[in-house]
Amino acid sequence: MIVKGLNIQNFRNIEKAYIEPAEGVNVIFGENAQGKTNLLESIWLFTGCKSFRCRRDREMVGFDAPFAKNEMTFFAKGREQNAHLFIDQKRTAMKNGVTLKSPAELVGEFYAVVFAPSHLSLVKEGPLFRRRFLDTALCELK
């Protein structure tokens, strides 16, 4: 799976951005509070999972914005595909022009693994937390 393009609108502090990653490894860098983690979170949502940073979808919508919209073009399963996420009080999703019953239907279409500072519990907590993290990460791999 390869991300070809990402269009973000009103997602947290990102009012509008279009990103076309280069082939291979891409490095995201910048000053604090400029949206690096927000960018990664917007990509993560296309895995069909919930945010790794908040419980309520509305928290992902930019200040004073009525909604957030993320669109991704990616190459997977031998062809170029697209997915759209619309976020207001909840998330709705489309894949290749078809509205999905739930964003969870994207699970297995796009793969990503996030390791965030909050995951330091992997070292500090017991085996139950480690197993849960590994189960989730392994579900993202083929």
What are these regions (language model features)?
Residues M1-L45:
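Pre-Walker A-like glycine/lysine-rich segment at the N-terminus of P-loop NTPase domains
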Residues T47-F129, L134-L141:
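Nucleotide-state sensing region of NTPase/ATPase domains
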